[in-house]
Amino acid sequence: MSAVIQAGGLGKAYRRTWALRDCTLAIPEGRVVGLVGPNGAGKTTLLRLAAGLLAPTCGMISVFGEEPAAGAAQLARVGFVAQDTPVYARMPVAAHLRLGAWLNPAWDSELARRRIAQVGLDPRQRAGSLSGGERAQLALTLALAKRPELLILDEPVASLDPLARREFLRGLMEAVAEHGTSVVLSSHLVADLERVCDYLVVLVASRVRIAGEVSTLLASHHRLSGPRRDPGALPAGVEVIEESHTDKQSTLLARTGEPIHDPSWTITPVSMEDLVLAYMSRARDDRTRRLEVVS
């Protein structure tokens, strides 16, 4: 499987502060990829580097095998929607579409007009008077109408109400189904990612903690509940990601490639949210232990 975005030892510093450091990952082509992690993980910096809006301090990043924003042809292959869904407040919707057509050689005017009509935007209305959901739909339309091969979305629904989020994501998935666009979607809203993504990347402190097809990850992780015991007594090949214990019971979230046949365990499936929170908690606990060793 070819990688649409590939990074190795990637870092970005602002003076003496690292926003992203020693990040290595590969994001597959032809997928809707959910990128999730805590605040400060480096998600926004990574996506802005991939979009060519920032230059790395160290390491490498490639998009479609080339340096991001290496030229007009490369820029045309990538669409980007930032969290604040930037639009020009004084410009009418129609003027945004004309500007998009002027800037993008592969601009699809019919797609742009159709989407504007579908989401109910008045072409004469100024962008500054649109609601947050309407501005997000305008920004998505501008990104889609350039007909990119890769669409990068940095928390585009973070400030939207549930109905606006649903409409935005529905429009996104309709476009993906129609044009086969690769998508990288960053969000804290795991429930939204679970609805639309088929590939997951969990990023914590610039490190990829887990990555893979959502269906495969969910099938290989389970929640185990049973009489209290040492997790080290589990069969070989079972990796405990998260654990909690009471006086009488142990509850584990574990990764395994083989079925667990011990009848004393009650085994239940996990959700994407369970998975994300477990790996984020594990990364936090690992960091706490390292700090304790240093001190």
Model-based region annotation:
Residues 36-38:
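The feature captures the beta-strand-to-loop junction immediately N-terminal to the Walker
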Residues 166-254, 291:
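ABC transporter nucleotide-binding domain
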